[in-house]
């Protein structure tokens, strides 16, 4: 197998599209710099606060900047959000009451959203548990069925939930902003008061527009994904209409307290500001990494989504690896080529919020940061790996090259007892990683 030829071909795929994504990064950086300049960001805003933090000007100023960037009435950017899932839950639970109805417009959401909703898995404190009605509209041919969504609207409908990213699904595409706008327009034509809520995780700054530019009333995401630029150590954000954001803030803190409290500890404020400034550039490093991965693994005969030449609307690259051991081997290769915990061997485990065991490769500086190069997937057929992130494209290249050499072509792989797939490669790091797996599962092989 001439891997160097495959890698060179993949680089050509990246270069063919680079100008488009560089232009997007340029325009989004201009938007952020303009907001920083308008709000006269200074070193003073990056100081830590303690206790109630009533007068945290840096926190409040960052809210204003996010509202400007996303063109919304208000924003809530806080380190007190423990994850993107938390921000999504706060946004929904803050704006819904018993008897209200939510329509899931993008089919089955990813696993952690299912626990927030309480369907199909019953969870204490979920929407369904609190008496909120949930209706789910399947997507058709990977696209939103706007007609079915609109037909499902009743007088009780309070919110339409839109998941931008594909999540752990190979049956749908990530939505572009224009498609989200079309759905929102259709919903608001029927009922302008319905809250169109977008889960924007993984999608920020991949396009020139955001869902709030095309009518979204409420939107949420994670700071250890795109908008944190690889520097934010924790946190999440909610942006949208003032009343919706206020309701969410009351859910995060307490009724009446809303966004007026919440200390910014340590160096977090600077990391939030600097991370946001870096975000458009870092997001495009991740996009280029995803294009490269798609090109390499499609050349090796694996199904990839999106395709190498497909326009990107988030930073996720899905690769169908066809077996559980291929999935494990891929994650091992990514982990071995990480800057942190490179000596660790990933293995499947039960993780809160997920219905199947999950395997993750995440040798990241910030735990769980998916804007840093990481890969994960549920241990279920067809064994898709979802790779995302990459603070630098160069790091992404190195890790993907190693994963390709470790797994080999889809049609010419050699199978071992236990269905571990290994190529006859002589790279010492790859051999050492494979030996760990073989030893762990008591396998036998003559091909190491």
Q: Which positions does each model-derived feature cover?
A:
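Conserved PLP-enzyme active-site core in the AAT-like
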Residues: 2-16, 22, 32-38, 42-45, ...
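Structural motif
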Residues: 73-76, 100-103, 158-159, 193-196, ...
């Amino acid at each position: 197998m001439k891997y160097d030829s495959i890698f060179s071909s993949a680089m050509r795929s990246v270069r063919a599209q680079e100008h488009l994504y560089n232009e997007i990064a340029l325009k989004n950086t201009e938007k952020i710099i303009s907001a920083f300049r308008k709000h006269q960001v200074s070193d003073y805003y990056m100081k830590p606060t303690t206790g109630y933090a009533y007068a945290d000007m840096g926190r409040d100023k960052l809210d204003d900047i996010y509202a400007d960037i996303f063109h919304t009435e208000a924003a809530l950017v806080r380190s007190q959000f423990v994850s993107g899932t938390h921000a999504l839950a706060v946004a929904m639970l803050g704006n819904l009451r018993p008897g209200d109805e939510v329509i899931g417009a993008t089919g089955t959401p990813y696993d952690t959203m299912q626990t927030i909703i309480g369907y199909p898995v019953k969870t204490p404190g979920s929407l369904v548990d609190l008496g909120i009605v949930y209706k789910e509209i399947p997507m058709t041919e990977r696209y939103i069925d706007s007609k079915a969504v609109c037909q499902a609207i009743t007088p009780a409908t309070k919110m339409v939930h839109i998941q931008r990213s594909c999540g752990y699904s190979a049956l749908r595409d990530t939505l572009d902003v224009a498609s989200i706008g079309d759905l929102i327009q259709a919903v608001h034509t029927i009922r302008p008061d319905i809250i169109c809520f977008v889960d924007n995780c993984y999608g920020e700054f991949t396009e020139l527009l955001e869902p709030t530019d095309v009518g979204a009333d409420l939107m949420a995401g994670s700071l250890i994904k795109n908008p944190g630029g690889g520097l934010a150590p924790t946190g999440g954000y909610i942006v949208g209409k003032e009343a919706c954001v206020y309701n969410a803030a009351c859910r995060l803190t307490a009724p009446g307290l809303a966004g007026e409290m919440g200390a910014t500890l340590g160096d977090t404020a600077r990391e939030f500001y600097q991370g946001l400034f870096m975000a458009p550039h870092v997001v495009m490093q991740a996009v280029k990494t995803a294009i490269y991965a798609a090109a390499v693994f499609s050349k090796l005969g694996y199904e990839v989504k999106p395709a190498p030449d497909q326009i990107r609307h988030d930073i996720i690259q899905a690769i169908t690896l066809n077996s559980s051991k291929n999935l494990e081997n891929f994650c091992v290769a990514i982990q071995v080529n990480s800057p942190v915990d490179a000596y660790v061997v990933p293995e499947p485990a039960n993780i809160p919020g997920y219905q199947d065991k999950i395997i993750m490769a995440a040798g990241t500086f910030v735990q769980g940061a998916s804007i840093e190069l990481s890969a994960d997937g549920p241990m279920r057929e067809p064994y898709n790996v979802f790779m995302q992130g990459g603070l630098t494209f160069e790091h992404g290249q190195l890790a993907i090259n190693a994963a390709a050499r470790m797994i080999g072509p889809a049609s010419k792989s050699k199978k071992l007892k236990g269905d571990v797939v290994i190529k006859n490669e002589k790279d010492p790091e790859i051999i050492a990683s494979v030996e760990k797996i073989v030893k762990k599962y008591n396998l036998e092989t003559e091909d190491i």
